[in-house]
């Protein structure tokens, strides 16, 4: 079973049901991976999502990634990649997969640049962050391609177009 805990700062209050959006994004991402069984597992797998401002994400990015600027999304996995497979044997009853943190200003700017609604872009970022929590990365080109393919599939199930498509003007 999956639980998605959402904490949104006031500047995210724009009429969007962020909790529903986050649950749908996390679920769609998980369904595209071999870890889809977690959605129906006896234990509780939790993903924590914080929707905050650029200043907080900037500070976290500087502290944990040594990058002195805000970024769109940060992911903090709490389970090592090689241990995810063994979660079915967990007797704890619950496991925190990790935290996903989005920066409002960066998200809004990027959505405007792409010509998509902020909620759609945030959905993409939550899918992306969820895949990181499940052990996926994009350091190497082949990893990036595999992760982007999973993102495309997950987003398509939510009715969202390919965010990586190259469009001609």
Swiss-Prot record:
Q: What is its main location?
A: cytoplasm
* Cofactor note text: Binds 1 zinc ion.
In Gene Ontology terms, what is one molecular function of this protein?
zinc ion binding
Q: Where does Zn(2+) bind?
A: 128, 132, 138
Listed under GO cellular component are:
cytoplasm
Q: Which cofactor does it need?
A: Zn(2+)
- Under which main EC class is this enzyme filed? hydrolase
In Gene Ontology terms, what is a biological process of this protein? rRNA processing
Q: Where in the cell does this protein reside? A: Cytoplasm
Q: Which UniProt keywords apply?
A: Cytoplasm, Endonuclease, Hydrolase, Metal-binding, Nuclease, Ribosome biogenesis, rRNA processing, Zinc
* EC identifiers of the protein: 3.1.-.-
Family, similarity comment: Belongs to the endoribonuclease YbeY family.
Functional note = Single strand-specific metallo-endoribonuclease involved in late-stage 70S ribosome quality control and in maturation of the 3' terminus of the 16S rRNA.
**Which HAMAP family does its entry note?**
Endoribonucl_YbeY
Q: What is this protein called?
A: Endoribonuclease YbeY
In which organism is this protein found? Rhizorhabdus wittichii (strain DSM 6014 / CCUG 31198 / JCM 15750 / NBRC 105917 / EY 4224 / RW1) (Sphingomonas wittichii)
């Amino acid at each position: 079973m999956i639980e998605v805990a959402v904490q949104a700062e006031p500047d995210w209050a724009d009429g969007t049901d962020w909790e529903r959006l986050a649950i749908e994004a996390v679920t769609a991402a998980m369904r595209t991976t071999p870890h889809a069984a977690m959605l129906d597992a006896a234990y509780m797998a939790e993903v924590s999502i914080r929707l905050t401002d650029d200043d907080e994400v900037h500070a976290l990015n500087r502290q944990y990634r040594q990058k002195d600027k805000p970024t769109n999304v940060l992911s903090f996995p709490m389970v090592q990649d090689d241990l995810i497979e063994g979660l079915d044997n967990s007797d704890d009853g619950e496991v925190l997969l990790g935290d996903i943190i989005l920066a409002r200003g960066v998200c809004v700017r990027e959505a405007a640049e792409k010509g998509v609604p902020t909620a759609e872009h945030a959905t993409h970022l939550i899918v992306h962050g969820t895949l990181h929590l499940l052990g996926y990365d994009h350091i190497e080109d082949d990893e990036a391609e595999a992760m982007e393919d999973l993102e495309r599939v997950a987003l398509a199930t939510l009715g969202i177009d390919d965010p990586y498509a190259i469009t001609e003007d």
